[in-house]
């Protein structure tokens, strides 16, 4: 990100995943729900295409609930919200900033993960994270909490804006301060600040792993990755990147991707890909997983423009433990590297190469992902690819059969695709504001729609519909079919820079400033949360 960026930045039950408690079937417990392949799809039914988000009261950020329709509740967030919603065991988790501070002890800039009651939107607890002293180069002001947690039983795992992987008790401090971490009273205000008394409304940190201290990583402007939990392991991007100069990489030998023990937070292994020296800018992706050739692989979009398939189980090599690269595939085509005269494009030129920020989606043994850049760099060329990882080894960019199809009409994209299993149709968006419907088998475009505003989030497919929002605050609802049919378009009153999700018959949409719980026939409470 460059110094002009003041207010914008982006960041979603399956055999083989061990949950400590049986999930409710219709929960959305992580980025991508219960699917380690991270497909943005829910099998829920009865989700309304039409609703009224309500009107703001005069000279107020409060919404008049009497003007809503099909809205159960609305909760006020901060002033910037890029985090994606997670719903599990009766709790709703959403990351935001500390504007309009809920807790009078903390009135300065902080990152906040809210835990709300799923039925009514009331605050249960909040995780308050102080800003890094190094400032915007690592932790941009007012950006808020970006990571969507992974809820595994009574524990949730997430990445803080301080570049820490944390395990939190889903009950907060309700049952006291549990776990090995006991200093929440000092953690919340930050180093060098007066310690505060821990209350029942505070988060309970079970353990934390500081990636800057332990690994020497240098997050560029923000740490953002939504962890993946597979059996007893946590996989996460480190957010290692450039410094303020946008030329120097302070920590090129630090890992880009790691795996931790979910019980203790101990480092189990790191990637062997040596991505660091080749990072274009920053790394803010989230991993996915799938079984390939009978073994679990972890899929990771690198800051160097390569899609990686790592063996899920680290092996000892020399003095460390490493996730071995099974294969990699370069998403940047040759014509995005040099112009017609052979002169290399200089990053971040609109015609040039991009990294991968979107999450790779594993669906029916294929992987789907697009390339893109920090939105502050503007629009540019893009590429959406479908990869068949079966049998791939080493650099598979030129391997016959690896690339099933490509779609180069898409522009730069940070959206994760959503695929409807009923039709095998893929839906996605790009930063230029276009929504695409593509046949997953052929890569052929079925239709596209211009939302006339930048798209930061991802589409959600549910109940034969596609929900997607844009920077102007418009939420579009399409029929999930080969023929374009716009079912509804409603303005939510503030930018939508995250992804709508569905849990237990309710659609959750978060704008920059509010989160809405939407359900057919819902009667709103009189008072906004």
Regions from the language model: what does each represent?
Residues 24-529:
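Noncatalytic, solvent-exposed loop/strand surfaces
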Residues 1-12:
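Bacterial N-terminal signal peptides that target proteins for export
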Residues 1, 15, 31:
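Conserved S/T- and glycine-rich ATP-binding loop of Class I adenylate-forming
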Residues 10-20:
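Bacterial N-terminal signal peptides
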């Amino acid at each position: 990100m460059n110094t002009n960026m003041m207010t914008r930045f982006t960041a979603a039950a399956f055999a083989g995943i061990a949950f400590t408690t049986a999930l409710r079937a219709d929960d959305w417990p992580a980025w991508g729900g219960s699917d380690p392949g991270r497909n943005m799809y829910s099998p829920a039914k009865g989700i309304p295409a039409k609703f009224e988000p309500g009107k703001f009261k005069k000279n107020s950020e409060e919404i008049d609930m009497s003007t809503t329709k099909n809205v159960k509740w609305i909760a006020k967030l901060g002033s910037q919200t890029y985090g994606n919603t997670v719903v599990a065991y009766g709790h709703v988790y959403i990351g935001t900033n500390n504007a309009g501070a809920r807790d009078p002890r903390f009135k300065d800039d902080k990152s906040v993960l809210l835990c709300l009651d799923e039925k009514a939107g009331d605050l249960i607890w909040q995780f308050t994270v102080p800003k890094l002293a190094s400032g915007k180069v690592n932790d941009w002001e007012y950006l808020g909490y970006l990571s969507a947690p992974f809820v595994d039983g009574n524990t949730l795992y997430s990445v803080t804006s301080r570049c820490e992987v944390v395990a939190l008790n889903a009950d907060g401090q309700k049952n006291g301060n549990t776990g090995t971490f006991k200093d929440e009273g000092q953690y919340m205000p930050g180093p060098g600040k007066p310690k505060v008394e821990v209350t029942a409304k505070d988060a309970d940190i079970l353990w934390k792993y500081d990636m800057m201290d332990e690994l020497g990583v240098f997050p560029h402007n923000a740490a953002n990755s939504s962890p993946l939990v597979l059996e007893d392991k946590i996989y996460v991007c480190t957010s290692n990147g450039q410094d303020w100069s946008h030329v120097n990489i302070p920590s090129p030998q630090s890992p880009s991707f790691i795996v931790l023990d979910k019980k203790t937070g101990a480092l189990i292994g790191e990637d062997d890909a040596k991505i660091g020296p080749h990072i274009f800018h920053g790394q803010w992706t989230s991993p996915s997983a799938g079984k390939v050739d009978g073994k679990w692989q972890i899929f990771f979009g690198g800051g160097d423009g390569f899609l990686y398939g790592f063996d899920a189980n680290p092996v000892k090599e020399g003095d460390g433990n490493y996730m071995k690269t099974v294969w990699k595939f370069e998403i940047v085509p040759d014509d995005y590297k040099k112009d017609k005269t052979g002169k290399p494009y200089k990053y971040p030129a609109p015609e040039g190469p991009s990294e991968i920020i979107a999450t790779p989606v594993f669906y029916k043994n294929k992987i789907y992902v697009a390339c893109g850049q920090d939105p502050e760099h503007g629009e540019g060329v893009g590429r959406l690819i479908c990869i068949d990882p079966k049998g791939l080894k080493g650099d598979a960019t030129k391997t016959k059969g690896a690339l099933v199809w490509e779609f180069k009409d898409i522009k730069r994209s940070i959206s994760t695709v959503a695929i409807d299993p009923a039709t095998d149709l893929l839906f996605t968006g790009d930063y230029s504001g276009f929504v695409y419907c593509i046949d997953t088998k052929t890569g052929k475009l079925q239709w596209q729609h211009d939302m006339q505003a930048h798209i930061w989030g991802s589409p959600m497919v549910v109940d034969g519909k596609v929900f997607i929002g844009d920077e102007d605050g418009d939420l579009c609802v399409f029929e999930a079919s080969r023929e374009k049919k716009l079912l509804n378009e409603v303005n939510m009153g503030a930018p939508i820079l995250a992804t709508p999700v569905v849990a237990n018959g309710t659609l959750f949409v978060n704008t920059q400033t509010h989160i809405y719980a939407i359900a057919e026939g819902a009667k709103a409470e009189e008072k906004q949360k």
